[in-house]
Amino acid sequence: MAQHVKKPEWLKIRLGGNEKFTETKSIVEGHCLHTICTSGKCPNMGECWSRGTATFMIGGDICTRACRFCNTLTGRPKPLNEAEPTHVALSIKLMGLNHAVVTSVDRDDLPDYGATHWVKTIQEIRRINSGVTLEVLIPDFKGRMDLVDMIIEASPDVISHNLETVRRLTPSVRSVATYDTSLAVLRHIAQSGKMPAKTGMMLGLGETEEEILELMDDALAAGVSVITIGQYLQPSRKNLPVVEYITPEQFEHLRLVGIEKGFRTIESAPLVRSSYHAERHL
């Protein structure tokens, strides 16, 4: 079985531990914040935290959905922490970030699916951090474009929403979300003309190259200009197993194909994640 195959050398990483890593950890924990770095068991956490960067996760640490690739806790979330937007903004200031990335759990339990909390967070980041550029990685808000408009009007510099996987695998990989709803969200962002629309996908779940290229074409047709492609890694036994480890050479091939197809920016390598080197995606 694929899950018993030894992890290849190119996926073995050194966990960070310098002074900047410790400082970042202290700031995050001191403000009682959540990051996708820890909840998602991101392989780049050592590198990013050692550079003083982190991807903040708002809305709490419990998601209302149960996507089979994701390690974030799922269940009934706690009430929103109204101080969270300010805590995130202050942490960005303390870290001295020039570019910040914020994502969230899905909050399908709320009437607005968390959109108002998103807007408050963006506004607080802008108020406290003059000159900082901001990327937001948003949920699909169940296809409610009026809620997507709230995020657009708050004016982050980049709005990202991940397709995650190819059309065929979406029902077995993602929870509640659909491929076409995600495309519609991306199209709506791009059509606003106010900021780049960005998406990301994982490889190694059993997709074919033909399906990957179809996703690229669908994303481009929706107006997406930035795409990230990385290797899926099984975060725990309850998650989907890895079907295949994609080689660095295959990732580079896809990067070149994506450039030829017309993406303005494409990151494609085994350890690439949506927010990895996000400052390049403005």
Curated annotation (Swiss-Prot):
Binding residues for [4Fe-4S] cluster 2: 63, 67, 70
Cofactor note: Binds 2 [4Fe-4S] clusters per subunit. One cluster is coordinated with 3 cysteines and an exchangeable S-adenosyl-L-methionine.
Enzyme class: transferase
InterPro entries named among the record's database cross-references: Aldolase_TIM, Elp3/MiaA/NifB-like_rSAM, Lipoyl_synth, rSAM
SMART domains per the UniProt record, alphabetical: Elp3
EC code: 2.8.1.8
Binding positions ([4Fe-4S] cluster 1): 37, 42, 48, 275
Pathway: Protein modification; protein lipoylation via endogenous pathway; protein N(6)-(lipoyl)lysine from octanoyl-[acyl-carrier-protein]: step 2/2
Cited PROSITE patterns: RADICAL_SAM (PS51918)
Record keywords: 4Fe-4S, Cytoplasm, Iron, Iron-sulfur, Metal-binding, S-adenosyl-L-methionine, Transferase
Protein name in UniProt: Lipoyl synthase
Organism: Porphyromonas gingivalis (strain ATCC 33277 / DSM 20709 / CIP 103683 / JCM 12257 / NCTC 11834 / 2561)
Gene giving rise to this polypeptide: lipA
